[in-house]
Amino acid sequence: MAAILSMLAPLLNADEKLEFSDYRNLWSLTAHRDRKTKDELLSLSIRTAVFIVLLRYGGYFGPKETPYGASLSSAEAVVAGMIFHIQEGITFNLHQVCGVVSDSILTGVAAPHVREFGTALFPTLLLLNHACDTNTLRININGNQVLMVAKRKIRAGEEVSDNYGIHYLSLTLEERQEALLKGFAFCCWCEGCQKDYPRMKSLRSQLPEDTEDKFDHLRENIKEMFRKGNHEECLKTSQAMIQLLEKARIPPPHRNYELASLSLISCLWKVYGNKA
């Protein structure tokens, strides 16, 4: 923790809080220039040139008329370098901003159908590493904000992780590694990758008989409560499903943990999430 705080020190305020509105966060993003192709670098250069032209003729660099095609002034060159650098970092550090497509498809026991509005930078989220078997869930709320909750008990000293949309439930190990390397320039070594967790249909589903009966009862209750519009109680019941599995010492990965997580995130989208 001390090492992490030392790295973050230039970006923290007096209360040791990360100021998300501080543009030094953008400057500090990992750029991975060595992983970019010539075409990608050319595209960034062209966009940078367009920005500079717009700033120049918008009067940002002063009222003086500048002939079309004139070389960059020293101020323009500095700003161009900053814009290029920030664009490099943004490439690998964007998060989706989504909304749930239709309330009618939310049943409380199935994955919600969400639509991407766009992408954004969330400096606090960038402090979390990706895991294909993440211990959190997140949704978009109030337009441009994020709500993140634990999907199971996170013990003291355990890393809090995020998922970049590439999950072990839907993609094989090889597919995940390829997608993460291409989209985020890293290879994942989370527990799900090290142990090559199976996909949803192949996950363990066995439970002690009394635990299974209680779990199935809670899940049926969620369907009924969701149908009646009692979504706050659905949230509590989803959490109770997870707590039931933890009390029975059922280790992840397990199909019932994922079923409980689906219920939890469906309820979260219904109660708090953006609507498409």
Residue ranges and their predicted role:
Residues 231, 274-275:
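TPR-repeat structural position
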Residues 225, 268-272:
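Residue at a conserved register position within TPR or TPR-like alpha-solenoid repeats
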Residues 23, 57-60, 68, 117, ...:
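Sequence-level detector for tyrosine residue identity
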Residues 2-12, 104, 110-112, 130-256, ...:
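C-terminal SET catalytic tail plus cysteine-rich post-SET Zn-binding segment of SAM-dependent SET-domain
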Residues 1-131:
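SET-domain substrate-recognition elements in eukaryotic SAM-dependent protein methyltransferases
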